[in-house]
């Protein structure tokens, strides 16, 4: 590369990443808006503690099925058309959620949204297309920052907006706002998001895009290092999703907190997670490597989950302990979330980035499907603290796997 073309390539890469950041941020902002009110909405429609976690679970079941489909399809047709379809369809899914008058229709709306928004692996593959391997953890951190900012603003405003009824129904305004954001996002991406995968780089060996392709899954996990990353990601997301979907019930039942107050805790999680993914990870990854970041993040989260489960025992100081635990969870997540896909991506072939990252995120989506149900079952059948105390042990086990298998 000549000296005069290198700055131009750097500028194009920065512009592409900036546009992708805005696209992912608006997508996740809409997702974050509905987090605080979904369990409460399910309860108002007659759901118990366990069933109240099902909207989150069915969303992730559909993501589990469709993440590898969109990932492999993007390896064949390019990233841009898949991302545009996903954003456009997600607007319809959010509108359906706002209009749904019964629990079965809420579940149907979340299922459709799960199909539509199964695009995270495509976004990660986009980053892999435009960043050299040495900068990949920094690039993946862009998605982490978008996640963090989505969790800062989305749950906070979702909690506040849920206080205002729409069409005589409480708690549905966040869904309509999310639908509007997705529509705006589609128009911006249609105009500004360039294709990252030129036709010559599109894999000729890409299989027909079908759900639950066992052969493709086996191919990805047998890539050295990728199988361990997939297993760790599954355990990590399993317990994180269980915490995320039961947290609203926990704060209401043990601390008497409203949707808005719970949204502020999620906002804290977003601030800390974004700070780690945008400031700490880019500096540490080149020095200590993604594997060590994953190990450290899992240990921090294990300690934080235990602290969260014990928070009600601290009496008047319990709320402060809850906030501390949330901040530590965010710090651990901020280290682990960008490091795992960066680790897997560095070990995948250039024409298998979508397949590898799709497999990683498909396992994560399965964990997000099982996690809320597991968390809800532990919450309802054993004790409200059980998802966090048992989750601490699970995260510690994932940390041990990381020490043994990630190099």
Give names to the regions the model predicted.
Residues 4-14, 194-231:
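Juxtamembrane intracellular "pre-TM" segments in multi-pass secondary transporters
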Residues 36-50, 245-262:
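Short amphipathic helix-loop junctions that connect adjacent transmembrane helices
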Residues 64-103:
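Conserved MFS/SLC helix-loop-helix module at the cytosolic interface between two early adjacent transmembrane helices
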Residues 67-78, 276-290, 379:
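Helix-to-loop junctions at the C-terminal end of transmembrane segments
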Residues 109-148:
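Cytoplasmic helix-loop-helix junction between adjacent transmembrane helices
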Residues 143-191:
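Helix-loop-helix hairpin linking two adjacent transmembrane segments in secondary transporters
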Residues 292-340:
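C-terminal transmembrane helical hairpin of 12-TM major facilitator-type secondary transporters
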